[in-house]
Amino acid sequence: VSVYPLMIEEGTAFARAVAAEKQAVPDDGDEALRMEEADALLSSRGFARYEVASYAKEGRACLPNQAYWTGISYLGLGTGAASMFGCEEFPVLARSFPQLGKPPADAARIRLSCTTDRAYLAAHPALSEQSFDVEYLSLRESLAEDLMLGARMSCGISPALVSRARDVMGTELDDCLSSLTADAYLAESLAPTRRGWLLGNELYGRLWELSSG
């Protein structure tokens, strides 16, 4: 089960109703209250929260979700599909997607989003015929992203990830984690506290600041 705060998409009837003040929008306090209510309801039905917005019964957590939150590479196929690969997979990626060209020298991770429309994709299904929005991340950016995603997991940021990040970020990482712990966003185990869960944007934003050095 996934539980997310309401997102109002531009151009929808809902957005027009909000703009015309015909539909109320919950504020941050309302959203936090609803998240806590959903957590209590799902917990009473045997569901445990394993990620900020994801719940499952014991042993039934979604493996693709866990792969995404822990930085494991994944391939998405079709219009709008997203993919992510590490630098060690670039050579294989180049053979399947020659249109991407050579990545920047400092790239450690690549994110792809397929922009090919359905009609063209049906007529030209080969991977080499597809178009993508491409984003390259440096090693430091990749580690900051993994720290941010790790903080979304109920089990928290792993010691192995902290060790890898410290090799690149040094004392900046320790200072950031100490600050987040002192401000009660993270527990000593580096798992998100209830405050960190409800005020996730602050927690993730401060971790992402490590990406710029």
Residue map of PLM features:
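A short, conserved structural fragment
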Residues: 181-190
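C-terminal scaffold of the Radical SAM
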Residues: 1-167
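Short amphipathic alpha-helical interaction segments
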Residues: 166-181
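Non-catalytic, well-ordered alpha-helical scaffold segments
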Residues: 141-148, 174, 197, 201
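Intrinsically disordered or highly flexible coil/loop and linker segments, enriched in small
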Residues: 156-157, 186, 213
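Short, amphipathic alpha-helical interaction segments positioned at domain boundaries
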Residues: 195-213
